[in-house]
Amino acid sequence: MNRVEQREWVFKLIYQDSISKIEDIDKVLEELDLTDEDFVRMSISSFLENFSSIDDKLTSNLDSKRKRLSKVLRSILYLSINEMYFMDIPVSVSINEAVNLAKKYSDEDDYKLVNSILGSIVRKDGK
């Protein structure tokens, strides 16, 4: 499985967690036949471990209208923030992948919002 496919699985797991909290990541990965995917395991584990910081970073960068993001968009943004701040994935790679996920899984122009929000977070932090 290539990195794009792995990242897509991580996005799906973050989305799943937003609906029903993941209690046992090993069990979930086994059920999905993802136990050999180290990047998926590392990424979702990092997200679950750092959720409060990731959520704070996102929420503090949203205006009142944007606080009502869909779970899909929020999951994409969580994925990218986790990668940039807790996994040392290059900013440009993470934002580009988030935009691509938004184009695939969200409404037509939502990718622009994803790009704008992530760009704002990165500029604010000087990353």
Kindly give the residue locations of the regions a language model identified.
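N-terminal interaction/assembly modules
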Residues: 1-104, 108-111, 115-127
